[in-house]
Swiss-Prot record:
It holds the Pfam family CBAH. Induction: Up-regulated in the presence of a mixture of unconjugated bile acids cholate (CA) and deoxycholate (DCA). Changing residue 226 to A: Loss of both hydrolase and acyltransferase activities. Its EC number is 2.3.1.-, 3.5.1.74, 3.5.1.24, 3.5.1.-. Changing residue 172 to A: Decrease in both hydrolase and acyltransferase activities. Taurine binds at residue 82. This is Bile salt hydrolase/transferase. PANTHER family: CHOLOYLGLYCINE HYDROLASE (PTHR35527), HYDROLASE (PTHR35527:SF2). The gene is bsh.
Length: 317
């Protein structure tokens, strides 16, 4: 399971991050794909003549960078989140469309587009084709894509591709995005305000303290509950002005829905936990990351690497 969040500062800079929740690590690390790095897309999907530099969290499999989440120097970011039971992809390319393998979709987006507007326009003629990396299972995902202005959710299901405008700038897992947005209506009465004294009959009632207005916000770690909680937190967090404060906001917001070892078993009996939290700031083109066992937040600035290199860069944590 996973959670994603996006917001911007008063200068329009992107802050985008995610939790990756699972029972084991894939050996993920910070990967930098410079502008000069060349790779062939599986089905020949086109792109920029001069592609963007990309930084994010992922693994190298079959000699390819495969990103869980990533961003480019223009402030466009993308993350794949688990979506089993709903995600449905074709297994062969469709003639007359731009065919993109599911595992290369994050890199293809970040490498070739500068904004959500550009991505949304391109998706009108894109087919997402399921391709399984040798030794791995099919990835059943939906995607959260954001920039300094807005975010969208891309869900490929049996009835086709759905591109949703995400007005709360968060995403979790299944059910569908439409369900999550409808479910928010159950929580319209919650508030971050201090509850006013009231009377019931002859009894005068006062709040115990701060937080009473939040009564009803779910505390479990299921996908619908995390969506509600992170949407509430993202909507009510005070606007911040500088990089450090916004990175703190990003990690605290995602911390409100982190999964702790022992809280929730998966079907195989293993406990799910937040393996890592990652985030990106377009203000400084810096990726941030911490892990379950090392909560110190590490920073990885694009400026520290040769963004015109022809070599893929894997950064040891």
């Amino acid at each position: 399971m996973c959670t994603g969040v996006r917001f911007s500062d008063d200068e329009g800079n992107t802050y985008f991050g995610r939790n990756l929740d699972w029972s084991f690590s894939y050996g993920e690390t910070i990967l930098v794909t410079p502008r000069g790095y060349h790779y062939d897309t599986v089905f020949g999907a086109g792109g920029k003549a001069k592609p963007n530099a990309v930084i994010g969290v992922g693994v190298v499999m079959a000699d390819r960078p495969m990103y869980f989440d990533c961003a480019n120097e223009h402030g466009l970011a993308i993350a794949g989140l688990n979506f089993p039971g709903y995600a449905s992809f074709v297994h062969e390319p469709v003639e007359g469309t731009e065919n993109v393998a599911t595992f290369e979709f994050p890199l293809w987006v970040a490498r070739n587009f500068d904004s959500v507007d550009e991505v949304e326009e391109a998706l009108r003629n894109v087919t997402l084709v399921s391709q399984i990396v040798p030794g791995q299972q099919e990835s059943l995902l939906h995607w959260f894509i954001g920039d300094g202005k807005r975010s969208i959710v891309v869900e490929q299901m049996a009835d086709g591709m759905h591109v949703h405008h995400d007005d709360v700038d968060v995403l979790t897992n299944q059910p569908t995005f439409d369900f999550h947005m409808e479910n928010l209506r159950n929580y319209m009465c919650v508030s971050n305000e201090m509850a006013e004294p009231t009377s019931w009959g002859k009894a005068s009632l006062t709040a115990w303290g701060a937080g009473v207005g939040m009564h009803g916000i779910p505390g479990d770690v299921s996908s619908p509950s995390r969506f509600v909680r992170v949407a509430y937190t993202n909507a009510h967090y005070p606007q911040q002005n500088d990089e450090a404060a916004n990175v703190s906001r990003l990690f605290h917001t995602l911390g409100s829905v982190q999964m702790v070892d022992g809280m929730a078993k998966m079907g195989d009996g293993q406990f799910e936990r937040t393996l890592f939290t990652s985030g990106y700031s377009s203000k400084t083109n810096t990726y941030y990351m911490n892990t379950y066992d090392d909560p110190a937040i590490r920073s990885y600035a694009m400026a520290d690497y040769d963004m015109d290199s022809s070599e893929l860069i894997s950064v040891a944590r």
